[in-house]
Amino acid sequence: MRTMQTITLITPVVLAFMSFIQPAFPQESVPESVVFEKNIEYSNPDDQHLQLNMARPKVGAEPFPAVICIHGGGFRAGSRESFNGLCLQLAEKGYVAVTVSYRLAPRYQFPAAVHDVKAAVRWVRANAAMYQIDPERIGTTGGSAGGHLAQFLGVTRGVKKFEGDGGHPEYSSSVKCVVNFYGPSDFTKSYDASVDAKDVLPLFLGGNLQQQRHRHIESSPLYWVTPDAAPTLFVHGTNDAYVAHEQAEWITERMKAADVEATLMTIDGGDHGFRTSSPEVKTMIDNARLNFFEKHLKK
């Protein structure tokens, strides 16, 4: 029996939605125990030469589990460089961690970004032997728009229509687990609950809810939840002005109904990116992510 848990550090729910704000990870120097490689091309859709950065342990018990890190930015901005610090932290803990670029709106609308992150997972599997990765132990994490894309990976395992043509089609794009930081789950309920959804979503989906209702549904992870979805840790604040805390509640309950493991960690007063949260709360969040990956990716 799969389980659902809720870690409640708060009670009120504040309506909100999506932005360019990203979690702040220290861009520290590369630790002696880590190999850090940048600008590795993983896919080339429409001559875009998509790249990733990779951090991996120099030594340890090979093969290593891997984590795909996906940046936020409202689907129209952001950079993989913002997750370099997280990748270095994960590599110190025994993971091969990659932070990936993907195609952005408005030039590239849904599902281009989904195709790209799935191509990144397939690339990691195709190159597992080269980088001492266990292809059966790949997880993902992301924040805001990146949380949405990470969640989409987790709920569309085996759904061929979203694979795209980004290379290595013989490999699976499935992930074993997801850590979703304040990513939206249902775009059909966003316009009145966010400071910028009316500006962001039409760029990503080709129109507003009235014009493109089908695409709003098709791009919402909530509607793709099945018993095959990956176990997920949701981390969300109650004072998020861009992605409402209730977005995490809805998909947690949907996964519970499908008998999929889901944990909602609610941060009392947490904003989008947890920038105003105390160092103690940020440490607690970091530990929760590591513990979740330890549970699902470490042997």
Kindly give the residue locations of the regions a language model identified.
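Positively charged n-region of N-terminal signal peptides that target proteins for export
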Residues: 1-9
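Bacterial N-terminal signal peptides
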Residues: 8-23
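Alpha/beta-hydrolase superfamily serine-hydrolase fold, recognizing
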Residues: 25-299
